Amino acid sequence: MKKGLFIVSILLLSAVVHGQQEIKLEELTKHVGDSVTVCTKIYGGIFLDRSKDTPTLLNAGDKYPNAPLTIVIGPDARQKFKEKPEVFYKDKEVCVTGKISLYKDKPQIVVYNEQQIVVK
């Protein structure tokens, strides 16, 4: 019985992992609402410590204001990072996994933990 439960658990876990579709930056707007993986360079970022929600914003794919994707890290998620994300990820190639949403018609991925951003 335990062996069967273990096998079912492994199958479910692999289905979740493979459920993330890797897409190109040019395809972001076609996948709003989807959970995807996007690989690109981080060109910079900022910690808005005086803003109401104190987010950290990473510019993916180009410099601000031309970045085709913004990676948003909220204050609770930021505390889980070992280093300042806006410093650590700058000029690095990364793969970010998460759900694409739009903010003012611009694609973004909200990150809830450090494991969603992997340095290549």
PLM-predicted stretches and their roles:
Residues G4-S14:
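Sec-dependent N-terminal signal peptides
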Residues H18-K120:
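OB-fold and OB-like single-stranded nucleic-acid-recognition modules
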